[in-house]
Amino acid sequence: MRHASKSAALAIALAGPMAWAACDKPVYLTFDTGHMEVAPLIAEVLQRQAVRVTFFAANERTKVGDGSLGEHWAPWWRERAAEGHEFASHTWSHVYWRADLPGAAPRFKVQASAGAQQGLLLNWGAAEYCQQIQQAGDRLQTLTGKKPLPLYRAPGGKTSPQLLAAAKACGYAHVGWAAAGFLGDELPSDKFSNPLLLAKALRDIRSGDILVAHLGIWSRQEPWAPAVLEPLLLGLKARGFCFATLREHPAYRAWVAASG
């Protein structure tokens, strides 16, 4: 079984650009880090379905181990790189933008939701914010041996034009998600059951959409993954969709290529 698993991973990794050349109705599945308990199961589904995704990573608290970018999870990240997935920053301390601050130079009120400063409201300049993006990217490169994409996702998708301009100036383009691409794994399961979320996604997703889910959500009682993930992938394939990473996304392709 181990040999077969490695062979499948190699086949996915080697598919490369030829796989995407035939992808004329693409969607772009992305995962943000979380408590990581379901991460191994998500990886199994992605490998079984030969789907490559883009992972946005922060060093978040985990149910097992020393944080989602800690040493405990290092083998998991290396395996995903070997399978041909892409990686990008989610800010090191999972930092939420709260407000722009007045002044000539860009400054922001932010709140870390992981690490030593968790919960604190902080006033940061552009350099401090960019360092947060870069720190997660540097750690990803150490873990995976692969250069991350010059992209990032702000936690919660919370941004301002000034914040986006500051990140762009230090080399990072922001990636959000399509309205239909919000897969709902953060929503309470007593009101938004897995079958309901699956049906909504299969009904609403359109070609070109960026989709977002997480590697574990602390607050959801009925985990979204892997229960919804495989039926979603199968259902989208049956509707003629194919899957690509953000390296191939038309809005980011030139930006990624220019970064080398």
Ranges and model annotations:
Residues 1-9:
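Bacterial N-terminal signal peptides that target proteins for export
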Residues 16-18:
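N-terminal signal peptide c-region/cleavage motif recognized by signal peptidases
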Residues 20-113, 117-121, 132-150:
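Active-site beta->alpha N-cap acidic-glycine motif
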Residues 33-38, 58-72, 95-100, 151-161, ...:
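Acidic-and-aromatic substrate-binding clefts and catalytic sites of carbohydrate-active enzymes
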Residues 53, 63, 221-260:
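C-terminal domain-boundary segment and adjacent tail
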Residues 55, 87-89, 176, 213, ...:
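Hydrophobic residues in well-ordered beta-strands that form the structural core
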Residues 86-94, 157-159, 212-215:
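Histidine-centered catalytic micro-motifs
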Residues 158, 163-204, 241-252:
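His/Asp/Glu-enriched short active-site or ligand-binding loop at hydrolase and phosphoryl-transfer sites
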